[in-house]
Amino acid sequence: MPTFYTCTRVDASPGSTVGACSKEDSYKTIAKAINRVHKEVPEVVTVIENMANAKSNLVGTTFYDLKEIIALVEDKNRVRICLDTCHLFAAGYDIRTRDTYRETMRKFDEEVGNGYLAGVHLNDSKAELGGCKDLHENIGL
């Protein structure tokens, strides 16, 4: 495995089960990979980005998925979450108004914990709420 000499954070998308295993098994596989990276590159923090399609084999589309992956990571101080706003919207998390955004973030805090939030990939969506499509749009268009 290459050493990330100047990199202190690595952003990773959880990926898909491709129908080959259960989501529960994929949580274990993802956490195992994160644990390996942490052992081999001691200074790196892994940042998991949420995924878009909650109706598929994708892992990381729900706050529950993210929570389950984190639960299996050995060093929880070295794992964080980046929320992609298009992916949130595609997965059915409504963030269109101040109130719905606050409710979504309350759910995130309740299920995952705000302490794990490292960043936000801020963008808009070309698709409808819960449309399960990863179609990024410029903000406001």
What are these regions (language model features)?
Residues K39-P42, E68-R78, H87, A91-R98, ...:
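Short helix-capping and hinge/turn segments at secondary-structure transitions, especially at repeat
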